[in-house]
């Protein structure tokens, strides 16, 4: 019921405000985001873009359910802080003081598109794709120019996992987001992602299911074959 949703959300928000909030931002420990591997102290500890977007989505829904103005205030303050600290007019930071291009911006845009205007998202995606786009139709999990970038999957060795490997779930989410922001401008990227994902599901890995990820250098089925 709506009451149960409201109660669960309220409990969750109160806990997050008490234990996981600093200067209005949500703070996570290392390895607590979906990118849960560490190489050379690269572990995403701190204040991360998609986590803030999810918090903003919680505030937005809670206001819609309760009409309690405090949630609208929480939402507006965090949104303002995000625009001030994360957006430099060209790309949206992956974390506070970390402008390393990563595809987590697409999670943020999917979870809370109100963070920026369509024109701002368009510029953000256009600039970020220069560093993340893989010609076969996927996204690298880190800037292709990063010293941590690895173009071939390293299997159970975590080296390439979130530093090169391309994850199909985030590729497809990116296609949905690009389609929403400007389907004409990003038409080629969207179609390439659809084609690559379709080919992987039908002809590679485990037929009818998406594999976990692909190497950055070429379309392949790696990781769990039925993700």
Feature map (PLM): residue ranges:
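Extended glycan-interaction surfaces of carbohydrate-active proteins
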Residues: 14-46, 77-166, 194-227
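Conserved small-residue packing positions in alpha-helical repeats and bundles
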Residues: 56, 63, 106-109, 175
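Aromatic-rich carbohydrate-recognition surfaces in CAZymes
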Residues: 1-27, 48-52, 56, 165-181, ...
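Aromatic- and glycine-enriched pocket-lining scaffold segments that form the walls
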Residues: 11, 15, 47-66, 71-76, ...
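Inter-helical turn/loop segments and adjacent helix faces that build the functional surface
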Residues: 1-3, 59-73, 115, 181-184
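Alpha-solenoid repeat scaffolds
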Residues: 69, 135, 184-185, 204
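Solenoid-repeat scaffolds in large eukaryotic assemblies
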Residues: 71, 75, 121, 186-190
């Amino acid at each position: 019921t709506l009451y149960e949703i409201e109660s669960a959300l309220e409990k969750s928000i109160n806990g997050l405000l008490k234990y996981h909030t600093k200067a209005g931002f949500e703070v996570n420990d290392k390895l607590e985001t979906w990118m849960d591997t560490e190489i050379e102290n690269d572990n995403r500890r701190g204040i991360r873009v998609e986590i803030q977007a999810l918090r903003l989505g919680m505030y937005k829904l809670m206001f819609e359910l309760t009409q309690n103005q405090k949630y609208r205030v929480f939402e507006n303050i965090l949104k303002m802080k995000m625009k001030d600290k994360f957006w430099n007019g060209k790309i949206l930071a992956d974390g506070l003081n970390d402008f390393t291009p990563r595809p987590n911006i697409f999670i943020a845009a999917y979870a809370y598109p109100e963070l920026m205007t369509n024109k701002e998202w368009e510029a953000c995606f256009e600039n970020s794709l220069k560093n993340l786009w893989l010609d076969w139709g996927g996204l690298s999990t880190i800037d292709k120019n990063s010293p941590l970038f690895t173009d071939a999957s390293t299997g159970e060795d975590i080296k390439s996992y979130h530093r090169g490997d391309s994850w199909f779930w985030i590729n497809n989410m990116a296609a949905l987001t690009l389609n929403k922001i400007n389907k004409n401008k990003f038409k080629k990227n969207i179609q390439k992602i659809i084609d690559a994902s379709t080919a992987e599901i039908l002809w590679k890995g485990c037929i009818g299911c998406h594999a976990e990820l692909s190497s950055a250098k070429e379309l392949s089925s790696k990781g769990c074959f039925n993700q």
